Amino acid sequence: MDPNCSCAAGGSCTCAGSCKCKDCRCTSCKKSCCSCCPAGCARCAQGCICKGASDKCSCCA
């Protein structure tokens, strides 16, 4: 569990734009969990690797 997030990994949570999770794995999280992921990335919470400061990452390219 992310110490900055009150939800269990892979569970549902109330994360929104104000989510402070640094490594959120919530399936219901609507926030872009990676700084490079677009908000609509459905696989964001499955653990992506960012490729620099662009909008591309390993799961949302």
From Swiss-Prot:
Binding residues annotated for a divalent metal cation 7, in chain numbering: 50, 57, 59-60
Q: Which Pfam families match?
A: Metallothio
Which GO terms of the molecular function aspect are on file?
Answer: metal ion binding; zinc ion binding
> What does the entry list as the binding residues for a divalent metal cation 2?
7, 13, 15, 26
Q: Name one GO biological process term.
A: cellular response to zinc ion
- Which parts of the sequence are annotated with region: Beta? 1-29
| Region described as Alpha: spans on this chain | 30-61
Give binding positions for a divalent metal cation 3: 15, 19, 24, 29
Q: Which GO terms describe its cellular component?
A: cytoplasm; nucleus
Query: Where does this protein hold a divalent metal cation 5?
Result: 34, 36-37, 50
Going by the entry's taxonomy, the superkingdom of the source organism is recorded as Eukaryota
List ligand-binding residues for a divalent metal cation 4. 33-34, 44, 48
Q: Which residues bind a divalent metal cation 6?
A: 37, 41, 44, 60
What keywords would UniProt list here? Answer: Acetylation, Metal-binding, Metal-thiolate cluster
Q: Where does a divalent metal cation 1 bind?
A: 5, 7, 21, 24
Q: Coiled-coil segments, which residues? A: none
- Indicate where the modification N-acetylmethionine is found in the sequence: 1
Family, per entry = Belongs to the metallothionein superfamily. Type 1 family.
Q: What does this protein do?
A: Metallothioneins have a high content of cysteine residues that bind various heavy metals; these proteins are transcriptionally regulated by both heavy metals and glucocorticoids.
Instruction: Tell me how this protein assembles.
Output: Monomer.
Domain comment, as recorded: Class I metallothioneins contain 2 metal-binding domains: four divalent ions are chelated within cluster A of the alpha domain and are coordinated via cysteinyl thiolate bridges to 11 cysteine ligands. Cluster B, the corresponding region within the beta domain, can ligate three divalent ions to 9 cysteines.
Q: What is this protein called?
A: Metallothionein-2B
Name the source organism: Sus scrofa
